[in-house]
């Protein structure tokens, strides 16, 4: 689960991490009060969306002006003007795609006198089962670009969970950033606090970009992105309360209500499969035959008729779907249950696109019989290869 920048900074503040003061606003009329409380003389007006690249982004609406999603203001009136322009406008960044995201909240933050910008992040290293630090002197940039163009400017290391964070980890960060004396001590303290916060809140990723050294000689987290392990949210009611569903895909939210593993993709073939491995193989073979999947959808091993019906409705709610492939290998999951769910869903929501069904395994004959006698226009398939070819040909011929 992701949260907004201002929320992430509030979490960091709980652990004593140095961040700038600021106030979130949801209406343009709140901008003046926020700016006045901060006092100036310089403010930063930041769009709050779950996407990076805000500063270099562009708004779709001409009324929002030609500046990006992060703007420097030198007067209270300028803060008010930017708030009026940016709120409820659509911001397009490298991470939002061409559709962009509507800005429904802003963060008014005090300005900082920046001397240097750095990059610092913590993430779960799946290969070592440890927390990894990634550090670079190239802050304020896309770390992917730095890794591609100047990989030698990136330093990374992992923390042994048996010992936890230690002073030498802080020194490693300070050395990587070229910090000495008091600034090196600040880096050691910062690293300890970030690691403590990461563990305490069950984060998956914490990115500070940029981490800045101010002209006053202080380290400060100027931006913060946080992602949390969804499996741990039951023990973090405070974090759950920060969820902004308007930033999430509506179909993915609906799928989560039924414990369906659903991810929206950008293709045209909807997929319903049981098992993550089979789902990925199904997507691969669709690509092999020249088309792209519209989603990843794993209904799991013990899906009910109602769960299958919900899954089918979610797929058909995507206007980009031009055909649907259902690929079920029944082990725990019974093929007749899948068939009943599909028939019920089609009768309820209708079917305007080709549908190919491949069933194999437990109660397969009963499942095929249910579909055959349903009166629905369904193309049966004998195996995965046959199913993929049939759905691709059906969509191309539609």
From Swiss-Prot:
Name listed for the protein in its UniProt record: Succinate--CoA ligase [ADP-forming] subunit beta
Top-level lineage group: Bacteria
The reaction(s) this protein catalyses: succinate + ATP + CoA = succinyl-CoA + ADP + phosphate; GTP + succinate + CoA = succinyl-CoA + GDP + phosphate
Binding site for Mg(2+): 209, 223
Pfam families noted in UniProt: ATP-grasp_2, Ligase_CoA
Subunit composition and interactions: Heterotetramer of two alpha and two beta subunits.
Cofactor descriptive note: Binds 1 Mg(2+) ion per subunit.
Catalytic class of the enzyme: ligase
Amino-acid positions noted as binding ATP in the UniProt annotation, renumbered to this chain: 46, 53-55, 109, 112, 117
Family of the protein in this entry: Belongs to the succinate/malate CoA ligase beta subunit family.
Keyword Nucleotide-binding included in the entry's annotation: yes
UniProt-listed Enzyme Commission number(s): 6.2.1.5
Originating organism: Rhodopseudomonas palustris (strain HaA2)
Keyword Nucleotide-binding belongs to the record: yes
Domain ATP-grasp: 9-254
Keywords of the record: ATP-binding, Ligase, Magnesium, Metal-binding, Nucleotide-binding, Tricarboxylic acid cycle
Cofactors that this protein relies on: Mg(2+)
Pathway(s) it belongs to: Carbohydrate metabolism; tricarboxylic acid cycle; succinate from succinyl-CoA (ligase route): step 1/1
Any one GO BP annotation for this protein: tricarboxylic acid cycle
Binding site for substrate: 274, 331-333
Function: Succinyl-CoA synthetase functions in the citric acid cycle (TCA), coupling the hydrolysis of succinyl-CoA to the synthesis of either ATP or GTP and thus represents the only step of substrate-level phosphorylation in the TCA. The beta subunit provides nucleotide specificity of the enzyme and binds the substrate succinate, while the binding sites for coenzyme A and phosphate are found in the alpha subunit.
Example of a GO MF term: succinate-CoA ligase (ADP-forming) activity
Residue ranges that the Swiss-Prot or TrEMBL entry lists as coiled coil: none
GO-annotated cellular components: cytosol; succinate-CoA ligase complex
């Amino acid at each position: 689960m992701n949260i907004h920048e201002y929320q992430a900074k509030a979490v960091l503040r709980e652990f004593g991490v140095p961040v700038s003061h600021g106030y979130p606003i949801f209406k343009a009329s709140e901008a003046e009060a926020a700016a006045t409380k901060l006092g100036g003389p310089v403010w930063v007006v930041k769009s709050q969306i779950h996407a990076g690249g805000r500063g270099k982004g562009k708004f779709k609406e001409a009324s929002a002006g030609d500046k990006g999603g992060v703007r420097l203001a030198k007067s209270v009136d300028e803060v008010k003007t930017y708030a009026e322009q940016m709120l409820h406008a659509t911001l397009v960044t490298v991470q939002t795609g061409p559709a962009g995201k509507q800005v429904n909240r802003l963060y008014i933050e005090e300005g900082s006198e920046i001397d240097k910008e750095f990059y610092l992040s913590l993430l779960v290293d799946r290969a070592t089962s440890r927390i990894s630090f990634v550090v670079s002197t190239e802050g304020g940039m896309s770390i992917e670009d730095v890794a591609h163009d100047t990989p030698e400017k990136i330093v990374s290391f992992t923390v042994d969970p048996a010992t936890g964070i230690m002073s030498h980890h802080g020194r490693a960060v300070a050395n990587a950033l070229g910090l000495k004396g008091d600034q090196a001590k600040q880096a050691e303290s910062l690293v300890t606090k970030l690691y403590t916060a990461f563990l305490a809140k069950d984060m998956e990723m914490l990115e500070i970009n940029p981490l800045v050294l101010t002209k006053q000689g202080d380290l400060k987290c100027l931006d913060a992105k946080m992602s949390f392990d969804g499996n741990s949210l039951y023990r973090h009611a405070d974090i759950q309360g920060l969820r902004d569903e308007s930033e999430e895909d509506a179909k993915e939210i609906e799928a989560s209500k039924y414990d369906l593993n659903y991810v929206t993709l950008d293709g045209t073939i909807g997929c319903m499969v049981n098992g993550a491995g089979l789902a990925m193989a199904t997507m691969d073979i669709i690509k092999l035959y020249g088309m792209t999947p519209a989603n990843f959808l794993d209904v799991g091993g013990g899906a009910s008729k109602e769960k299958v019906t919900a899954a089918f409705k979610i797929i058909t709610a995507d206007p980009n779907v031009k055909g649907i492939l259902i690929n079920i290998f029944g082990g725990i999951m019974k093929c007749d249950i899948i068939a009943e769910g599909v028939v019920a869903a089609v009768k309820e929501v209708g079917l305007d696109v080709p549908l190919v069904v491949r069933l194999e395994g437990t109660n397969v004959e009963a499942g095929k019989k249910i579909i055959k006698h349903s009166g629905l226009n369904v193309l049966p398939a004998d195996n995965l290869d046959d199913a993929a070819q049939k759905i691709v040909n059906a969509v191309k011929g539609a």
